[in-house]
Amino acid sequence: MKKILGIESSCDDTSVSIITEDREILSNIVISQNTEHADYKGVVPEIAARSHLANLEKAMKQALLESNTSLDEITAIAATSGPGLIGGVIVGSMFAKSLSSVLNKPFIAVNHLEGHALTARLTDNIPYPYLLLLASGGHCQFVAVLGLGKYKILGSTIDDAVGEAFDKVAKMLDLPFPGGPKIEKRAKLGDPYKYKFPKPIINSGDCNMSFSGLKTAVRTLIMSLQEINDTIINDIAASFQFTIGEILSSKILEAIKVYEQITNDFNRNIVIAGGVAANKYLQELLSNCTKIHGYQLIYPPTTLCTDNAAMIAYAGLERYNNGLFTPLNFCPKARWSLEEI
């Protein structure tokens, strides 16, 4: 049975996973760096890279032990090779290449975004094509997933990623890092209609998004307040999250229009992937929104929304099955669009 070892190190989570050709996740070890970055309330690239270097071997040993697998049983090694914080990407890629060379196993460079894009095929085995909303700390885009390595970006943020907006607003409210889950938790206790925030380019008639102005509006409000208490924090979090939901709901309908123009898709599946996909409020909102238009919204389990190596291993499996191996002289990339794969 084929077993793929996946490595993920593009940001602040060190992860190693082993999956089988039957899409069974035998192990998916994630070593978080939240404590290392907590004081900075954001990811420090140099600290992240050093932590990946210190944690990768430990994560691999745990993955092998948990899956009851030896290195000799590994069929191929897949690693995130971009986009991402280049220090961490290089650490993970070089680790994978070294294993590939020593074990004489194929190396497969995986685009981190492709890993997110294909997660629903790992978990739900959905067919191509489908519409994807990739929403994370570094990216926010609508993508037509037409096949393996065949992606068309329909629209994207013109400034900040939606996950970045969550984290920055959390920082403004002095909430712990990572901020996204903290905003969601506080929003449950607040009034989503308390503060009216702008929805930049919501009526632009395309699939592009903007979150910078929203972030600025939140900062302006906070600076205007004489005091900040828990009630105010909860109301700001709820109003901010509500506004994000309004923007994404509007734009996903625009994306459906464009998607239907370029594909004869009768599956009518929409996938939301990336860290923001773990937000339960947005899951329910977008699910109801798309259901009205005859689409099913699919989102991975929470553990597979955030960065993980299982999705990298699965992307590696699809590439292995199609004979798409990578030479060891492949250079990791800080920037790497899905359309450039």
From Swiss-Prot:
Claim: tRNA processing is one of the keywords in the record: yes
GO biological process: tRNA threonylcarbamoyladenosine modification
Gene Ontology cellular component list: cytoplasm
Reactions this protein catalyses: L-threonylcarbamoyladenylate + adenosine(37) in tRNA = N(6)-L-threonylcarbamoyladenosine(37) in tRNA + AMP + H(+)
EC number from the UniProt entry: 2.3.1.234
Stored Gene3D superfamilies: 3.30.420.40
CDD domains, per the entry: ASKHA_NBD_TsaD_bac
Keyword tRNA processing: yes
Superkingdom assignment: Bacteria
Named cofactor requirement(s): Fe(2+)
Residue positions binding substrate: L134, A135, S136, G137, G138, D167, G180, N279
Compartments where located: Cytoplasm
Cofactor binding remark: Binds 1 Fe(2+) ion per subunit.
GO molecular function: iron ion binding; N(6)-L-threonylcarbamoyladenine synthase activity
Family indicated by similarity: Belongs to the KAE1 / TsaD family.
Function: Required for the formation of a threonylcarbamoyl group on adenosine at position 37 (t(6)A37) in tRNAs that read codons beginning with adenine. Is involved in the transfer of the threonylcarbamoyl moiety of threonylcarbamoyl-AMP (TC-AMP) to the N6 group of A37, together with TsaE and TsaB. TsaD likely plays a direct catalytic role in this reaction.
Alphabetical list of PANTHER family matching this protein: TRNA N6-ADENOSINE THREONYLCARBAMOYLTRANSFERASE (PTHR11735), TRNA N6-ADENOSINE THREONYLCARBAMOYLTRANSFERASE, MITOCHONDRIAL (PTHR11735:SF6)
Protein name: tRNA N6-adenosine threonylcarbamoyltransferase
Gene assigned in the entry: tsaD
